[in-house]
């Protein structure tokens, strides 16, 4: 079967897996297909996940955004008025954003000889572009600063400094930008900065906490890139990987004012007991900041000669957009849909166990096959000795462990990172269902042992339940698709009402 999927660019013909579709009414489009309740299986869960991710890919959302600005007559987006257009940035979506931008500029009649750019991206996404250099800054599965990324960040800073008074800077920011744009403060080596980041990751620090520290040991984060730009206007285009889309947190806000301080960075390290573990150079740098001996990160947007801000930020896509597209596809596939929203956060295991309890409850209450969709991003606190995995694989394993304590049939979970990566692995996440439990029992695998060791990758690899979609060239946190086959009872909406009544 072929057709235009919800969330896919107009005219993009996509082959749709048909394992879960019933017969189609003649002469009907995808929005009018008539089908019996679909069979719930991994293929359906994966198709829903892909529909959500496709809607937040740059080749779809960036042209849509620019077209909207053109129709609204926003003078800032008349690209022909600028002598030079400088393009910089970093993130997992950087390559696709740069390619889509070049194509959009060409369509707008811009002479590309006036365009110059440098964007730090994962190695696997590099491709030749006409005027924007895509710099291979790190290999897949290495979500931490590298010497290659630091070199690229220095080039980006130099390019921003080269702007003339009437030039435009377009900054392309997406998830993963913090690790792809490392430029340590004077006196701090990249290895020392890596040591700090690894310690924070191990402790389960939130992205906001990590970035408060990163911004205060960096020459490019926390608004410092915008501070170095000397041109007319900076337009920052963002694909958000942070709950609530805070501009100062996404990729550590290289062009955004920073509300955090050296005191905040110090407090984060103190909270996790890391002050004695971090390198002396980092501790001394932060202490100098606390004493006011070195400048704070900028707290306001830089102003132009006309007194107006020289930087404007635009969020093109977020976790909410992916959830909406996934929900639309699920409904058109014949499912009832419940959205838990883009705000799930906290320690992975208790969040996953709660979702497993909800799945058991709803299965007894709903009467239609239902998709329960959730986003956000949980965290995993790791001991120094641990196995292999990522937060989505750990989520699926904790969910499965809880589900195994009752009847696991009729429930399928797909937990996946929308960037196609999950921790330092080649998987985006994993499936959790009754078949996984059967395979584990056959092989004598103890779920609790793997969960205790934080070794979810090894477990799911052994039972052929890893989810490996490859790099998606976007990143809007995580997307979980939970499919539930009804045992008996009422509608999904009524089940929610009843749950709130009993839980309250």
Q: Residue spans of the language-model regions?
A:
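Short hydrophobic alpha-helical segments enriched in small aliphatic residues
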Residues: 9, 19-22
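N-terminal glycine-/serine-/threonine-rich phosphate-binding loop
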Residues: 29-86, 95-108, 112, 143-165, ...
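A glycine- and small-aliphatic-rich helix-loop capping segment at beta-alpha/alpha-beta transitions
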Residues: 100-111, 131-134, 184-195, 229-231, ...
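Glycine-rich oxoanion-binding loops at beta->alpha junctions
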Residues: 119-165, 208, 213-214
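Conserved phosphate- and dinucleotide-binding cores of soluble alpha/beta proteins
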Residues: 168-169, 177-251, 259-268, 425-427, ...
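Gly/Ser/Thr-rich active-site loops/lids in small-molecule metabolic enzymes
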Residues: 188-206, 258-273, 385-413, 501
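Accessory alpha-helical/coil subdomains and C-terminal extensions
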Residues: 214, 232-235, 257-354
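Internal helix-turn-beta structural module
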Residues: 398-504
